[in-house]
């Protein structure tokens, strides 16, 4: 006995075939934009869980977890910034970047910490802040196992292992591993520059410690410790 077709006039196998062909067509369209995808749509949730990034840019090989993110990324290569701020005229590739930028003008801070009530302009800043309360440190060093709450702190720490010093002083070419260390160092050059109060005023080259009341003891102490740099604190003739 022959089995009849299900209601609707289309067999189940034919329906599955059409769905498969539809996915293949979508895949071919996305591959034109440099996208690599999988046909199984049920994998999308699992991809997010394991940080899988199947959508790849053909221009720079950067990968993304969502096709919409790749589409926005490709605007970087085209150079088109279609989202413009009405207040200052600055343009952005993505509407989300414009929304974040607008908060500079409006002062809006929509992201609130439930623990302490502090508010933030960006959700990423709130996530970083919440780790103060939770103690979470997801960024770990492969060399020594030390963990940090922010990726920027891990990057700074890793320079203790690599010896990298990317911040260079323009005055003396001395290099530092952290920008804060460079800023602290730059004060040395500012202290050395002469400050004149009048036409016949004496030139002062003493460091800040002299002004703070630490006097000659502090300067003498620096001369003893530094040795070779003692000449920096001598008066000009």
Curated annotation (Swiss-Prot):
GO terms for cellular component: nucleoplasm; nucleus. Keywords: Acetylation, DNA-binding, Metal-binding, Nucleus, Repeat, Transcription, Transcription regulation, Zinc, Zinc-finger. One of its GO terms (molecular function) is zinc ion binding. Expressed predominantly in developing craniofacial bones and dental organs, and in molar tooth germs of postnatal animals. Also detected in embryonic heart, liver, thymus, kidney, brain, lung, muscle and calvaria. In the adult, highly expressed in lung, kidney, bone and incisors. A zinc finger (C2H2-type) spans 55-77, 83-105, 111-133, 139-161, 167-189. Residues 1-34, 188-219 are annotated as: Disordered. Residues 188-217 have a biased composition (Basic residues). InterPro entries: Snail/Krueppel_Znf (IPR050527), Znf_C2H2_sf (IPR036236), Znf_C2H2_type (IPR013087). Pfam families: zf-C2H2 (PF00096). It is found in: Nucleus. SUPFAM superfamilies: beta-beta-alpha zinc fingers. The modification N6-acetyllysine is found at residues 18, 23. Binds DNA through the consensus sequence 5'-CAATG-3'. May be involved in transcriptional regulation and may play a role in tooth formation. Belongs to the krueppel C2H2-type zinc-finger protein family. This is Zinc finger protein 22. It comes from Mus musculus (Mouse).
């Amino acid at each position: 006995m022959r089995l009849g077709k299900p209601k609707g006039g289309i067999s189940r196998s034919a329906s599955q075939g059409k769905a498969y062909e539809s996915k293949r067509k979508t895949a071919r369209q996305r591959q034109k934009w440099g996208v690599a995808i999988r046909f199984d749509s049920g994998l999308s949730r699992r991809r997010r869980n394991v940080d899988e990034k199947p959508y790849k840019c053909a221009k720079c090989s950067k990968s993304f977890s969502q096709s919409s993110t790749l589409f926005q990324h490709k605007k970087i290569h085209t150079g088109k910034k279609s989202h413009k701020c009405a207040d200052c005229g600055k343009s952005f590739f993505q509407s989300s970047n414009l929304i974040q930028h607008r908060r500079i003008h409006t002062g809006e801070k929509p992201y609130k910490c439930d623990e302490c009530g502090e508010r933030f302009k960006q959700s990423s800043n709130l996530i970083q802040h919440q780790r103060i309360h939770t103690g979470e440190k997801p960024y770990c060093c492969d060399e020594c196992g030390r963990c940090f709450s922010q990726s920027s702190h891990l990057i700074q720490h890793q320079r203790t292992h690599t010896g990298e010093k990317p911040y260079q002083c323009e005055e003396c070419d001395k290099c530092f591993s952290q920008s804060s260390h460079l800023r602290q160092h730059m004060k040395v050059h500012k202290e050395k520059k002469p400050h004149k109060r009048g036409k016949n005023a004496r030139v002062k080259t003493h460091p800040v410690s002299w002004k703070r009341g630490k006097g000659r003891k502090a300067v003498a102490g620096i001369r003893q410790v530094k040795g070779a740099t003692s000449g920096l604190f001598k008066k000009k003739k």
